[in-house]
């Protein structure tokens, strides 16, 4: 939760009495007075030392019992700002019963802050509903800040936008206004990204309507800037006086300009014949689909080289001699390893696989890959974040399974979790009963209730194909283990499958292309499927891979995306690590009624 710095409430009568007492005592010896402590606490608030301020206010609540509730609320508020919600609740819990009537506004605001920090936005709104809108500017802006963000989190974008727009009436500082508008832009874009309704009543004021209409535009600016210029221009014609034009959109337009500045010529090196043809063609098609999203005037020249028909070295040198300003490819791990020592360091390369872990990338040599190990690590982080650090794993007996299992186990151990048991299965078989019963320690004694181990709070099913997972999950339920949450990788999910009901309840990470329902991703996905109607949708992830590879070219030439400013790609949120590898943060979904529901 964002920290809010506010001037502590003045306790005029008590402060005056205490200051007089302190002055009298100073004739004998120097002592620290409550007023001194209050000033010190206020100084810590201004300096952003929220934990220190919280402790000081807590001490004041004891030292000045007549003002206990006021100081306890200030302490709780600062603990929230310090992101220590346990301490905040403890301080809040010391309030007297009279605080509800004596300090209704302050009490409700702090209670709402605590609820919001605990991911309970509905609870935050409930607390705010107990009071009238504050008239004190400081309290009013905090009221609308909490109410607006809570409304967005409960899926009410219209109400959230109204609240944050109303908040601006109580903001006089230019920096605070800009921060509020940045928040509005992020919130309406997030609402669009999560498929929330951005509709509004017919007589909605223009500023509110403009923000809501900007949601999808902002998402397109982030996820598909190649196609966004026309959409943005149309919005600006409709809302020429909108406050978003004054700052936040200028930054967005600068980012779009950077995201569409391509070299004059790009070379794409892929296997388009032989053993790797089907994968190479799918990546090429996705790359070209992104290329076609861009207006013809802004497109670079694109030359495609089949590295299966000629040597990699020959294709690379030919691309350079023919004027390539950026190389994308090759695709296989072997070819990427072979290209690295050939790279001249001047012409940037985006390899579509990773070098070995102990191999340093040459200068201007970037790497992008769709690795199951990355998903396995993401699952490990998720189970720990969900409060389920200990569990069991079921993995296939093949090289893919070994890689995924090792990555999952390493990340889980690093985070303090543990795998209680790992069982292996043959993906060519259909009956996995023995592995499941051993893994879950199923006990089925005649005349007694069937039981399974109680120490496992998750089951990780590594499915190298969606077919295996669709067989495993029903068998888990058959063997009385359906009450334990199941996590898997994206390989377990295929879109548009009637058999997805067999993996009901499964939680998994996947790229937005596969699970997002926002209008921008749907437009991209539909345009690719229409352009390559004869291709199978089983190659969707490879289309997305090619699409994002094209998106990465201008970013890597100018300002490579960091973890704090990732690219909103269709394969995930993309950022570059210290080894010049593009990393992906994935979306999360759970199968509900046979369909992926965003988490």
Where are these regions (language model features)?
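Bacterial Sec signal peptide processing site at the extreme N-terminus
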Residues: 22-40
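Solenoid-like repeat scaffolds
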Residues: 26-31, 58-67, 93-103, 129-138, ...
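Beta-alpha junction/loop-to-helix N-cap segments that form part of ligand/metal-binding clefts
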Residues: 102, 278-283, 293, 297-358
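Extended repeat-based interaction scaffolds and adjacent low-complexity, acidic/S/T/P-biased segments
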Residues: 158-252, 257, 262, 299, ...
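Periplasmic-binding protein-like
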Residues: 320-332, 349-352, 390-396, 446-468, ...
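An alpha-beta-alpha
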Residues: 365-424
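Extracellular/periplasmic periplasmic-binding protein-like sensory domains
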Residues: 370, 456, 473-545
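Segments of small-molecule ligand-sensing domains
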Residues: 527-598
């Amino acid at each position: 939760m964002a920290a809010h710095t506010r001037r502590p409430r003045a306790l005029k009568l008590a402060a005056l009495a205490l200051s007089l007492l302190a002055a009298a005592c100073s004739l004998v010896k120097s002592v620290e007075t409550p007023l001194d402590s209050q000033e010190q606490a206020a100084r810590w608030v201004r300096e952003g030392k929220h934990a220190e301020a919280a402790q000081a206010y807590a001490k004041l609540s004891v030292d000045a019992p007549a003002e206990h509730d006021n100081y306890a609320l200030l302490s709780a508020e600062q603990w929230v700002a310090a992101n220590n919600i346990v301490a905040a609740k403890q301080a809040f819990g010391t309030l007297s019963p009279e605080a509800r009537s004596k300090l209704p506004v302050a009490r409700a605001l702090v209670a709402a802050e605590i609820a919001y920090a605990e991911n309970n936005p509905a609870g935050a709104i409930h607390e705010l509903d107990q009071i009238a809108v504050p008239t004190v500017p400081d309290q009013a802006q905090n009221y609308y800040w909490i109410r607006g963000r809570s409304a967005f989190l409960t899926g009410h974008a219209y109400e959230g936008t109204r609240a944050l727009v109303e908040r601006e009436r109580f903001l006089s500082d230019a920096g605070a206004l800009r921060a509020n508008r940045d928040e509005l832009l992020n919130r309406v874009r997030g609402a669009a990204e999560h498929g929330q309704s951005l509709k509004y009543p017919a007589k909605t004021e223009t500023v509110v309507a403009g923000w809501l209409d900007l949601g999808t535009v902002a998402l397109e600016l982030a996820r598909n800037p190649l196609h966004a210029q026309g959409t943005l221009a149309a919005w600006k014609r409709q809302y020429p006086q909108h406050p978003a034009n004054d700052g936040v959109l200028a930054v967005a337009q600068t980012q779009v300009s950077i995201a569409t500045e391509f070299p004059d010529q790009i070379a794409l090196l892929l296997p388009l014949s032989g053993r790797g043809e089907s994968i190479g063609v799918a990546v090429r098609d996705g790359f070209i689909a992104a290329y076609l999203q861009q207006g013809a005037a802004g497109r670079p020249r694109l030359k495609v080289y089949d590295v299966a028909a000629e040597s990699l070295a020959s294709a690379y040198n030919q691309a350079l001699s023919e004027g390539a300003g950026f190389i994308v490819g090759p695709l296989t791990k072997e070819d990427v390893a072979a290209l690295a020592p050939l790279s001249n360091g001047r012409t940037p390369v985006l390899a579509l696989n990773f070098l070995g872990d102990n191999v340093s990338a040459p200068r201007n040599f970037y790497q992008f890959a769709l690795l199951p190990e990355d998903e396995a690590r993401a699952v490990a982080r998720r189970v720990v974040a969900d409060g389920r650090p200990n569990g069991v794993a079921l993995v296939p007996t093949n090289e893919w399974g070994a890689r995924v299992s090792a990555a999952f186990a390493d990340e889980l151990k690093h985070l303090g979790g543990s795998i209680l048991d790992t069982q292996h299965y043959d993906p060519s078989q259909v009956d996995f009963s023995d592995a499941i019963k051993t893994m879950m320690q199923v006990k089925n004694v005649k005349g007694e209730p069937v039981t399974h181990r109680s120490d496992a709070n998750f089951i990780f099913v590594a499915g190298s194909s969606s077919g295996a997972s669709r067989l495993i999950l029903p068998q888990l339920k058959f063997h009385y283990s359906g009450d334990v949450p199941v996590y898997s990788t994206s390989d377990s999910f295929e879109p548009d499958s009637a058999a997805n009901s067999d993996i009901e309840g499964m939680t998994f990470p996947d790229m937005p292309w596969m699970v997002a329902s926002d209008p921008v991703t749907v437009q991209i996905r539909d345009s690719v499927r229409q352009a390559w109607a004869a291709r199978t949708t089983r190659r969707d992830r490879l289309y997305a891979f090619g699409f994002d590879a094209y998106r990465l070219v201008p970013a890597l030439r100018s300002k490579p995306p960091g973890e704090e400013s990732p690219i909103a790609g269709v394969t995930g949120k993309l950022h570059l690590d210290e080894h010049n590898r593009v990393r992906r943060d994935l979306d999360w979904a759970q199968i509900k009624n046979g369909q992926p529901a965003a988490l």
